[in-house]
Curated annotation (Swiss-Prot):
The keyword Ribonucleoprotein applies. Keywords: Repressor, Ribonucleoprotein, Ribosomal protein, RNA-binding, rRNA-binding, Translation regulation, tRNA-binding. Belongs to the universal ribosomal protein uL1 family. HAMAP family: Ribosomal_uL1_B. This is Large ribosomal subunit protein uL1. GO terms for cellular component: large ribosomal subunit. Binds directly to 23S rRNA. The L1 stalk is quite mobile in the ribosome, and is involved in E site tRNA release. Protein L1 is also a translational repressor protein, it controls the translation of the L11 operon by binding to its mRNA. The gene is rplA. It comes from Thermotoga maritima (strain ATCC 43589 / DSM 3109 / JCM 10099 / NBRC 100826 / MSB8). The keyword Ribonucleoprotein applies. Gene3D superfamilies: 3.30.190.20, 3.40.50.790. GO terms for molecular function: rRNA binding; structural constituent of ribosome; tRNA binding. Part of the 50S ribosomal subunit.
């Protein structure tokens, strides 16, 4: 069993572990239990009813949070010529082609949160799969990161579009803001995230798709949400 800090144990006392909280109350509580000295990220942990053994039930896509995550997103773009210029003008942090592939391969450069590529770049970045894939950074048409519309993609990811995927236990983890966000912004982000995840339900999923939703800060305890009231929001 991991040993928890005194701060965490004190925060856990504030949470009734048998209770399923309404969203407004959960947001108040998650802020109270976020007592670290930095501006903690507020995260949504969603347990789904997918069968992870079936690849067609894996979820991977993007959602848009109306107020972003509160984190400055570094965007890298693999593109050449006019598309490279468009990406830079849209605010991309790094733009290049073979030079960036080499930097990632030889120098282990990974100082970015999202990688976008034009379709013609896939032949040269394919070999980065082993490096970028496990980190969730490999451009993919499914997640909207392989596109000709690089300027639009850069702007959207900078504004608050984030990639989501199920992990090996069928759970989805989504940053929905910071402790410093006001309650209404957190609420709007959470509701937007849940609604968009509901739309990603794979056709083959039997029974309940979203089984449990937990709200937590980076260093704080989990707060279970009342699913019935949440899905009515």
């Amino acid at each position: 069993m991991p040993k928890h800090s005194k701060r965490y144990l004190e925060a856990r006392k504030l949470v009734d572990r048998t209770k399923y909280y309404d969203l407004d109350e959960a947001i108040e509580l998650v802020k109270k239990t976020a007592t670290a000295k930095f501006d903690e990220t507020i995260e949504l942990h969603i347990q789904t009813g997918i069968d992870y053994r079936k690849p067609e039930q894996h979820i991977r896509g993007t959602i848009v949070l109306p107020h972003g995550t509160g984190k400055e997103v570094k965007v890298l773009v693999f593109a050449k010529g006019e598309k490279a210029k468009e990406a830079l003008e849209a605010g991309a942090d790094y733009v290049g082609a073979e030079d960036l592939v080499e930097k990632i391969e030889k120098e282990g450069f990974l100082d970015f949160d999202v990688a976008i590529a034009t379709p013609d770049m896939m032949r040269i970045i394919g070999r980065l799969g082993k490096i970028l894939g496990p980190r969730g950074l490999m451009p993919s048409p499914k997640s909207g990161t392989v596109t000709q519309e690089v300027a639009e993609a850069v702007k959207e990811f900078k504004k608050g579009r984030i990639e989501v995927r199920t992990d090996k236990t069928g759970n989805i983890h989504i940053p929905v803001g910071k402790r410093s966000f006001d309650n209404e912004k957190l609420k709007e982000n959470i509701i937007a995230a849940i609604k968009q995840i509901m739309q990603m339900k794979p056709a083959g999923v039997k029974g309940q798709f979203i089984k449990k939703v937990v709200l937590a800060s980076t260093m704080g305890p989990g707060i279970k949400l009342n699913l019935q009231s949440l899905l009515k929001e």
